[in-house]
Design a protein with these regions (language model features):
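A charged, aromatic-enriched C-terminal amphipathic alpha-helix characteristic of glycosyltransferases
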Residues: 42-46, 326-327, 340-376
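Donor nucleotide-sugar binding/catalytic pocket of nucleotide-sugar-dependent glycosyltransferases
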Residues: 129-187
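Conserved donor-binding/catalytic core segment of Leloir-type glycosyltransferases
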Residues: 176, 190-212, 218-223, 233-234
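Nucleotide-activated donor-binding/catalytic signature segment of Leloir-type glycosyltransferases, i.e.
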Residues: 245-267
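Short alpha-helical donor nucleotide-sugar binding micro-motif in glycosyltransferases
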Residues: 271-276
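Aromatic "clamp/platform" in nucleotide-sugar-dependent glycosyltransferases that forms part
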Residues: 284
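Short hydrophobic beta-strand element within catalytic cores of glycosyltransferases
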Residues: 301-305
């Protein structure tokens, strides 16, 4: 059993769920240092110093780690410099839930995007022994975007280092806590409960942020309501916005069709997963998709865009799960008026998606950590750790 120091600069939401799940399910001894889920830009710019101090106290109490795993919302290069006197030289993994090269800029963000935070990501990748990305979509997009970033350097370009860093990049999906998510009946129409006369229950369960493109979903729902299509809707998920105006307007417009709204505690959320028929997304950005995985595991028929990480999630069920660009309203309409037919197109997806259950993926995490702790898969200078998975 290895001792693993887990550094989570943004302990909340999907980041916090990942860190907590790893601690609960791993066979290794995990020691966690973290900061709350707030001020993410400051975490990336300045969190290294205070996280290094927390790491110093953790090492003094628990002993030096065999492996260090650092979540990506911090300056890893700076953090390693600040911890060099007490940390020793354990292998270091950078885990990327997202990256700032590909993350869409908020329309409310002041000023133009700069290279500062993307370079924090790059320097972290350069100093890590291994880089774990939560999806092939993120890994491949990141590696494709890096040359353009690095080519903008005025001199001493880093482009020559890209190949060896790419060789240390692996796909290691996040685990999802599905133990309490009900196992559906295989989405076989004749086995499902009778249809609700008010129509299928449509679930929106993502963050209420610009990158999830809620406006497209809410507009589609309003149009379908105006056409007289029968449906109910649950508009739930994390919301840190002071004025989620489009959601408030949608709630007022849809009226009694809205059966749940806003953040739900775990018990209420799981109950909602059990009652929902359809999960919908129009996300501009999705490097993995925990909320959608939860809904599909519970038997929801997915109505998802063709891009992002979604093809990777649904695999051979793509024709029944993904809609072409611009066809959200049409696909959602078709699913709502023929729910049983669309259920039949995705039979088996609910079982296949459970490959992301923590109880399944933890073996891969633990084996990777054990190999690193043993020192048999580490060579930061030559990039000989093997190619991407």
């Amino acid at each position: 059993m290895a001792r693993v120091l887990l550094v989570e600069p943004f302990h909340g939401g999907s980041h916090g769920a990942w860190a907590d799940g790893l601690v609960v399910h791993s066979r290794h001894e995990l020691v966690v240092v973290s900061h709350p889920a707030a001020a993410w830009r400051w975490r990336m710019r300045g969190g290294a110093l205070t996280l290094a101090e927390e790491a110093r106290r953790a090492v003094a109490e628990h002993g030096p780690p065999d492996v260090v795993v650092v979540s990506g919302m911090v300056d890893l290069a700076g953090w390693l410099g600040l911890t060099r006197r007490f940390l020793g030289d354990p292998p270091v993994v950078l885990y990327l839930h997202e990256n700032q090269l590909l993350y869409p800029v908020s329309p409310n963000q002041k000023g133009s995007a700069s290279d500062e935070l993307p370079l924090v990501n790059w320097m972290g990748m350069a100093v890590a022994d291994q880089v774990w990305c939560n999806s092939a979509f993120q890994r491949d997009g990141l590696l494709a975007a890096l040359p353009d970033l690095l080519d903008r350097a005025p001199d001493h370009s880093h482009v020559g280092f890209l190949g060896e860093v790419a060789d240390r990049c692996y796909v290691v999906p996040v685990g999802v806590d599905l133990a309490d998510v009900p196992i559906s009946k295989g989405m076989v129409p004749e086995e499902m409960v009778p249809a609700d006369p008010a129509g299928p229950l449509v679930l929106w369960n993502q963050r209420w942020d610009h990158d999830k493109n809620p406006k497209a979903v809410l507009d589609a729902l309003r149009h379908l309501a105006a056409e007289g299509v029968a449906f109910r809707v649950a508009l739930v998920g994390e919301n840190e916005r002071v004025d989620p105006r489009e959601f408030v307007e949608a709630r007022d417009h849809l009226g009694d069709r809205v059966v749940a709204w806003g953040f739900q505690d775990r018990a209420a959320y799981v109950d909602l997963l059990n009652r929902s028929d359809v999960v919908v997304s129009a996300a501009h950005h999705e490097f993995f998709g925990i909320a959608v995985v939860e809904a599909m595991a519970a038997g929801c028929v997915p109505v998802l865009p063709t891009g992002q990480s979604y093809p990777e999630l649904v695999g051979s069920w793509a024709d029944g799960a993904l809609y072409p660009d611009g066809d959200l309203r049409t696909r959602l309409h078709d699913v709502l008026i023929d729910l049983d037919g669309w259920r039949a197109r995705v039979v088996g997806l609910d079982e296949a998606i459970r490959r992301f259950d923590w109880r399944t993926v933890i073996a891969d995490y633990d084996d990777r950590l054990e190999t690193l702790a043993a020192g048999t898969d580490r060579d930061i200078t030559s990039g000989t750790t093997g190619g991407p998975d």
